[in-house]
């Protein structure tokens, strides 16, 4: 068991779901389901196993998991993932049988059937169910509640089920289509979970039978109510309409965004895509950018439908994706988006938890890093990153790692003061000069290594300030990212060259951790500054509202949206005169009306 698996095992949730074991090449070699992901996945790496399982475990290099809402959902998702990926260690289902559905026929006098064959425009289908037994039990319950036609006898003859109170076909006029439409609508609502009315009716009948001392009949109604409660579990990972669709969910935290895409094909959730990256603008804006890039990749075929979270403007998505864009508002479809969002949150949290837990891996990394660079052991490392959007609200940030661990009390933020426009090199020169002129003249502790986020230009700018302007002797290295915003390579030396670092080494992990942390700190600060500037600029030109009062408003209301909802009294409570508060409200009202 490698270190990655050890740490990921500690972060597994106590939730139902599916897990996917992978080999060194990243190929899925086994798919399983679990009522409790934590307990099930851990069991592979504890205790003894039979020969077959030992062989499987010996090939596991990594694993992923998908959280579901119930064990039934996990079972159904497992079926789809196995059929889609055909992992070599999974037992193939005999004859590759499909799974049972309950069908309401399109006949003039509809019947309830169990079928494994789905044909378009041939009736209504509900399911799939994990096995024939489950489907049969649900149908039995429906037969006892809804008096559909049960056999192929002519409707003018009484059948056996009539005597059981389970068929009324012969008593209904041939032309009374409204009755059957109403019955079908009731079953649809029932199977979609809207069963409160039926339960209320059954409960009333149970109480009436009990009152009349018809205890056997009362027990039948009680059993029906119990049966309904048993089958209330929704199967959200399946879709009954056989539609191809992609389902997007996203979650943001600490300057990072995780997007999960569920691929539903022929009504089955067969695969997912997970991507995590730092975001720079508003979350909704960067999500839209991601969606555009996602479908520009020819590997991602555009389905008929795309489901998106309700916070996203569907008209903007429709402008870049030629598909039907849906923001589900209720029911199963909304729950699917919620499930994708939940998995995005879990994945992002796992990333952060892994980073924290893996700090233990850095114990020997500092010394090895010093040896690789040919410098003394870099006990104290200071790292810098710039953040701006086309030169607006430019800022920079510095994080400090001591003995391989973040020293947050030493973190620093910088607002760029002398640079106009988007000039990363000039911004880096300014920040490095401001920081290390203080180190030089105020006797502050100097680092053993400076790391800048960027390539040769940033490194040369920083080194020029350190060596020529300040006359200091502090090594400077650069960390470059790849096109996926992942730590890619370390630059060092004179002339600058790439330092070869194994991707699985402790030194590489330490640098990756530092780069992630300084980037997170920088963009979080940038977002705060940009939000504050936007808030203040919208309040310009209001007489009597200077910087201090704007600061009070920002501290109290946090956003323009909240301020626009504030009352005159709430604004005055901050010590703002009534005339100024009234002018502010008038200004906000006129802005919202335009």
Swiss-Prot record:
GO cellular component: cytoplasm; excinuclease repair complex
Pfam family, one: UVR
SMART domains: GIYc
CDD domains: GIY-YIG_UvrC_Cho
Biological processes annotated in GO: nucleotide-excision repair; SOS response
Keyword list, A-Z: Cytoplasm, DNA damage, DNA excision, DNA repair, Excision nuclease, SOS response
SUPFAM superfamilies xrefs: C-terminal UvrC-binding domain of UvrB, GIY-YIG endonuclease, RuvA domain 2-like
Cell location: Cytoplasm
The family this protein is said to belong to: Belongs to the UvrC family.
HAMAP family assigned to the protein according to its UniProt record, in alphabetical order: UvrC
Function (record text): The UvrABC repair system catalyzes the recognition and processing of DNA lesions. UvrC both incises the 5' and 3' sides of the lesion. The N-terminal half is responsible for the 3' incision and the C-terminal half is responsible for the 5' incision.
Oligomer status and interactors: Interacts with UvrB in an incision complex.
Protein name: UvrABC system protein C
Native organism: Streptococcus equi subsp. zooepidemicus (strain H70)
């Amino acid at each position: 068991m490698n270190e990655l698996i050890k740490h990921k095992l500690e972060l597994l949730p106590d939730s139902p779901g599916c897990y996917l074991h992978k080999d060194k090449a990243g190929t899925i070699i086994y798919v399983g389901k679990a009522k409790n992901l934590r307990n099930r996945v851990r069991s592979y790496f504890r205790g003894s196993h039979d020969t077959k399982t030992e062989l499987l475990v010996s090939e596991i290099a990594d694993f992923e998991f998908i959280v579901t809402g119930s064990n039934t959902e996990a079972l159904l998702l497992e079926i789809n993932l196995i059929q889609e990926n055909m992992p070599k260690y999974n037992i193939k289902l005999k004859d590759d049988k499909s799974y049972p559905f309950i069908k309401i026929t399109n006949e003039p006098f509809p019947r309830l059937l169990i079928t494994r064959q789905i044909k378009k425009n041939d009736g209504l289908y509900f399911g799939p169910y994990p096995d024939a037994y489950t489907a049969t039990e649900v149908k039995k319950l429906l037969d006892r509640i809804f008096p559909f036609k049960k056999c192929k006898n002519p409707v003018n003859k009484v059948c056996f089920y009539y005597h059981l109170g389970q068929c009324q076909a012969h008593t209904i006029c041939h032309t009374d289509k409204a009755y059957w439409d109403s019955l079908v609508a009731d079953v649809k609502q029932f199977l979609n979970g809207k069963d409160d009315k039926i339960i209320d009716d059954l409960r009333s009948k149970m109480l009436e039978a009990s009152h009349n001392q018809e205890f056997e009949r009362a027990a039948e109604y009680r059993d029906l109510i119990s049966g309904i409660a048993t089958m209330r579990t929704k199967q959200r990972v399946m879709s009954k309409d056989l539609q191809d669709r992609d389902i997007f969910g996203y979650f943001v935290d600490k300057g990072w965004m995780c997007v999960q895409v569920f691929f539903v094909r022929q009504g089955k959730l067969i695969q997912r895509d997970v991507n995590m990256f730092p975001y720079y603008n508003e979350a909704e804006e960067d999500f839209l950018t991601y969606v555009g890039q996602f479908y520009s990749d020819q590997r991602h075929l555009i389905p008929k439908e795309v489901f998106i979270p309700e916070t996203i403007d569907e008209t903007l998505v429709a402008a870049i994706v030629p598909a039907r864009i849906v923001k589900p508002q209720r029911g199963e479809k909304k729950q699917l988006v919620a499930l994708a969002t939940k998995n995005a949150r879990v994945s992002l949290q796992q990333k952060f938890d892994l980073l924290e837990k893996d700090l233990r891996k850095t114990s020997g990394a500092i010394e090895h890093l010093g040896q690789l660079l040919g410098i003394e052991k870099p006990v104290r490392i200071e790292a810098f990153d710039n953040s701006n959007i086309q030169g607006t609200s430019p800022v920079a940030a510095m994080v400090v790692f001591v003995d391989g661990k973040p020293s947050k009390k030493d973190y620093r933020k910088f607002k760029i003061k002398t640079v106009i426009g988007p000039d990363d090199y000039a911004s880096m020169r300014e920040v490095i000069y401001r920081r290390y002129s203080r180190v030089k003249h105020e006797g502050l502790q100097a680092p053993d290594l400076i790391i800048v986020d960027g390539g040769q230009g940033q490194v040369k700018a920083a080194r020029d300030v350190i060596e020529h302007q300040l006359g200091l002797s502090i090594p400077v290295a650069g960390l470059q990212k790849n096109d996926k915003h992942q730590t890619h390579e370390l630059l060092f030396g004179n002339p600058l060259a790439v330092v070869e670092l194994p991707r699985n080494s402790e030194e590489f992990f330490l640098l990756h951790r530092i780069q992630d942390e300084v980037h997170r700190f920088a963009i979080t600060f940038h977002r705060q500054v940009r939000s504050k500037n936007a808030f203040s600029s919208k309040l310009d030109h209001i007489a009597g509202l200077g910087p201090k009062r704007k600061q009070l408003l920002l501290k109290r209301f946090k956003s323009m949206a909240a301020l626009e909802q504030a009352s005159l009294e709430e604004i005055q409570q901050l010590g703002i005169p009534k005339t100024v508060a009234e002018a502010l409200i008038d200004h906000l009202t006129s802005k919202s009306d335009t």
